[in-house]
Amino acid sequence: MALVFSALLLLGLCGKISSEGQPAFHNTPGAMNYELPTTKYETQDTFNAGIVGPLYKMVHIFLSVVQPNDFPLDLIKKLIQNKKFDISVDSKEPEIIVLALKIALYEIGVLICAILGLLFIILMPLVGCFFCMCRCCNKCGGEMHQRQKQNAPCRRKCLGLSLLVICLLMSLGIIYGFVANQQTRTRIKGTQKLAKSNFRDFQTLLTETPKQIDYVVEQYTNTKNKAFSDLDGIGSVLGGRIKDQLKPKVTPVLEEIKAMATAIKQTKDALQNMSSSLKSLQDAATQLNTNLSSVRNSIENSLSSSDCTSDPASKICDSIRPSLSSLGSSLNSSQLPSVDRELNTVTEVDKTDLESLVKRGYTTIDEIPNTIQNQTVDVIKDVKNTLDSISSNIKDMSQSIPIEDMLLQVSHYLNNSNRYLNQELPKLEEYDSYWWLGGLIVCFLLTLIVTFFFLGLLCGVFGYDKHATPTRRGCVSNTGGIFLMAGVGFGFLFCWILMILVVLTFVVGANVEKLLCEPYENKKLLQVLDTPYLLKEQWQFYLSGMLFNNPDINMTFEQVYRDCKRGRGIYAAFQLENVVNVSDHFNIDQISENINTELENLNVNIDSIELLDNTGRKSLEDFAHSGIDTIDYSTYLKETEKSPTEVNLLTFASTLEAKANQLPEGKPKQAFLLDVQNIRAIHQHLLPPVQQSLNTLRQSVWTLQQTSNKLPEKVKKILASLDSVQHFLTNNVSLIVIGETKKFGKTILGYFEHYLHWVFYAITEKMTSCKPMATAMDSAVNGILCGYVADPLNLFWFGIGKATVLLLPAVIIAIKLAKYYRRMDSEDVYDDVETVPMKNLEIGSNGYHKDHLYGVHNPVMTSPSRY
C-alpha cells in the first residue's frame, strides 16, 4: 500500500513538473545548494544480540560443522519448480528421486544428528527398562554386595572426578537452556515494540513526504529571490564583470598618463624655481660683487697711504697687498641662459589640466555599472514577471496534488494493520508464555537430575570413610549413593522425552538458520526469488510482473532491497518510470526557454569609451617638444658647484685682522679693522642668499634633468599604448558587453536549471525513501524470525541437547560410582590379615571367606540395617 501511495504521489507531482532525458545534475557557480530535510527513523538497521551474542555465534559454528554445505540455490529452485509432486505414471520419478537424494545429501549432517537422536529416543527407554528389570533381579549391580579390590580408591576417585566434570558440562548446557528460554520470552515481548517502531517509521515517512514537497516548492522561492537579487544588482554584477575585463587594459595606460600629468606639474614647478633662482642669483651676485669691490678699494686706499710706506708698517702692508686680488666673487650667473621660453611652454601645457582628463577616463569606466543599471530597468521587470508566473504555476501544482487524500488512505491502512497486530501480538505472547513454562520445566528436570548427581557427589565424597568396610559405610555416604541412583532413575525416565524436544527443535532451528537466516543475510534468498520464471512460469521477473503486470521489466528483489537499504527514493528503487516517466512530463527545456527568451531582451549599449581626447594628446605632445630635454643642464650644475667667493671671507678677515693688529696705532690700523668688520658683515648677510639660490637652482636642475631624460620617447610610448588601448575599446567593448551579458543570462538561467535538475533528482532518487520498507523486512526476518526466535531456539536445543547427551555417560558413571558410596549387605574379605582383621573363617571355593553361603551368621559380613 505504501508503494501504491508513493506511486500516486509521484504521478501527481510529475504531472505538473517537466524535463527530457536523465538529469545531468551539476553545480552552477553561485547557485544554491539544495538538500531535502533529513528524515530520522526510529528502527535500527542492525539487531544486536547483546551479551548472548557469543553464545549464538558458538551455535552458528556448531551448525556450520554439522551443515557445512553452501546454500543450495539450485536445489531450492528445483524444489520450487517441482512443487507439485505428482507421483503418477507420467511423473518424472527418477528426477524426483535424484532431487530427494540431493536434499538428503545437503541435509546429511542434520539427518545424521536427527537419526542419532532418534536412536537415543528409542534405545534409552529400552535400556532403562531392561536395566530396571536387571536390577530387580539383583543383576547389573543390583546385588548389594561389593568385592573389594586394590585399585578401588583410584577407580572411585576417577569415577567421581569424571562425573563432576560431566555434571559441570551439563550445568553449562542447562544454563544455556535457561538463558535461551529467558531470551525468547524477553525478545518476544520486544516484538510488539519493534513492530510499533516500524509502524512509526512508516508514519514518519507519510508525515515527511508533504514536508518534502513543501520544501521543494520553497526552494523555488529561494532560487527566485537569488535571481532577483542578481537582477536588482545587475549594475554591480554585470557592470562589475565588464569593468573587471576593461580595467586590466585601461588602468596601466591611464596610470602612465596620470604620472605624466604629475611630471608636467613638477616640471612647471622646477622651471619656475629655476627661473626665480637665476634672477635671485644674479641680483645677489651683483650686490656681493659691489660690496666686495668697495672693501677691496678701501683696503687698497689704506695700503697706499703714507703710513703703510714707512717702517715698520711697510712690511706688513706689503704682505697684505698680494691677497687683495682674491677678494671677489667667482660667480658668472649673468651668462647662464634663461629658461623662460621652456617655462612658458610648460605653463601652457599645464593649463590643459591633463590630470582631470585622466580622471574623466577613469570615471567613464567606473560609470559602466550605473549605465547598465539604468538601461535594463524595463527588461529586468519583464524577467521578474516571467519568474513570478513560474512560481505561481509551481504553487498551483503543489496545491493540486491530492496528497491529503492519499495520506488518509495509507494512514488508514497502517492504522488497521497496527490495530490487527495489537490484537494478535498478545496471543503470541500468550503462546510464548506456554513455551517459556515448558522450557522452564525441561530445564528444571535436567537441573533436578544434575542436582541429584551433585548431591550424590557431595555426600559421597564428604561422607566417605576409607577405614569403613562396605557394610559399615556411614549414613551420609550411603545417602550420596542413593542420590546418584535417584539421578540415574530420573535420567532414564525423562531423557528420551528431552531428546524428542531436542530433535524437533534442532531440525526446525537448524534449517531455519541455514535455509532462511544465513541466505537472507548474504542475499542468496533474494536471488532465489529473482530467478526468472521460477515463482510464475510465464513471468521472467516476478516483482515487476506483480507490481506493474509487466514481467519483462528488469526489477529484482535484491536490487530493490539494496536501493531501499541505501535510502533511495521509491521512484528509483521500484523503477516507477515504467508507470509514469518523469522525463516525459518534467520539461526543463521549456521552462528554460521561457526564461531565456526574456533574458535575450537584455541588451546593453555602452557608448564608445574615449580615454583621452585630442586636447590631452596635444598636451602630451607639446610637453614632449617643450625643449626641456635640450637644456644644457651641465652648465647650470657647473655654476652651482662654484663657491660664491674666490676666497673664504672669514679666513681672509681673520688674516687681515691679525696683520692689522701688528700695525702701530694709526689710521691704517683703524681702517683695516673696519674693513675686517665689513668683510664679516658681507659673509653674514650677503653670502647666505647667494648660497640658497645656488641650492635651489641645483635642485631644480636635477629635477628637470630626470624628467627630461628621454622625454620624447616616453611620451611616444604612452601615446602608442593609448592608441592600442583605444583601438581595443573601439573594436572589442561591444563584444565584451555582449559576452558578459550572455554569461549573466546563463547565470540567471543556471540557477533555475540547477533547481529543476535538483527537483528531478530529488523526486527520482531521494523523495519518499523506501528505507522503512527494507528496515521492516529486516525487522521481520533478521529481527523477529532469526534474532528473536531462531537464535534463542537454537541456543535452547544446543544447551538442552548437550546436557541430555551427557546424561548417558553420567548415568553409567553414576551407577558405577554409587557402589562405592552405598552401604552393602555383604562384602568380600581378603585372606591377608593385614587387609581384613578376621581370619578364622572357612575358606570358600574362590579363596574368600563367605560365611553366608553356609548359613552361619557372621557379623563382619552382614550389615545391621539395609537401605
UniProtKB/Swiss-Prot annotation:
Residues making up the signal peptide according to the UniProt record: 1-19
Q: Which residues carry this modification: Phosphoserine?
A: S865
* Topology in the lipid bilayer: Multi-pass membrane protein
Q: Where in the cell is it found?
A: Apical cell membrane; Cell projection, Microvillus membrane; Cell projection, Cilium, Photoreceptor outer segment; Endoplasmic reticulum
PTM summary from the entry reads: Acetylation at Lys-226, Lys-258 and Lys-265 by NAT8 and NAT8B may control PROM1 protein expression and its function in cell apoptosis.
Q: What are the record keywords, sorted?
A: Acetylation, Cell membrane, Cell projection, Cilium, Endoplasmic reticulum, Glycoprotein, Membrane, Phosphoprotein, Signal, Transmembrane, Transmembrane helix
Q: Which domain of life is it from?
A: Eukaryota
**GO cellular component annotations, sorted alphabetically?**
apical plasma membrane; brush border; cell projection; cell surface; cilium; endoplasmic reticulum; endoplasmic reticulum-Golgi intermediate compartment; extracellular space
Q: Cytoplasmic side of the membrane: what ranges?
A: 129-158, 456-487, 816-867
Regarding tissue, the record states: In the submandibular gland, expressed on the apical side of epithelial cells. In the parotid gland, expressed in the intercalated ducts. In the sublingual gland, expressed in intercalated ducts. In the extraorbital lacrimal gland, expressed in the intercalated tubules and larger intralobular ducts. Expressed in the retina. Present in urine within small membrane particles (at protein level). In the embryo, expressed on the apical side of neuroepithelial cells and of other epithelia such as lung buds, gut and ureter buds.
Q: Which residues carry this modification: N6-acetyllysine?
A: K226, K258, K265
Q: Does the keyword ATP-binding apply?
A: no
Its transmembrane ranges are: 108-128, 159-179, 435-455, 488-508, 795-815
One GO BP annotation of this record: camera-type eye photoreceptor cell differentiation
Q: What else is known?
A: Fundus images and light microscopy of retinal sections from transgenic mice expressing mutant PROM1 reveal progressive retinal abnormalities visible as subretinal deposits and photoreceptor atrophy.
Write out the similarity annotation.
Belongs to the prominin family.
Role summary: May play a role in cell differentiation, proliferation and apoptosis. Binds cholesterol in cholesterol-containing plasma membrane microdomains and may play a role in the organization of the apical plasma membrane in epithelial cells. During early retinal development acts as a key regulator of disk morphogenesis. Involved in regulation of MAPK and Akt signaling pathways. In neuroblastoma cells suppresses cell differentiation such as neurite outgrowth in a RET-dependent manner.
What is annotated about its quaternary structure and interactions?
A: Interacts with CDHR1 and with actin filaments. Interacts with NAT8 and NAT8B.
Protein name per the record: Prominin-1
User: Which gene is the coding source of this polypeptide chain?
Assistant: Prom1
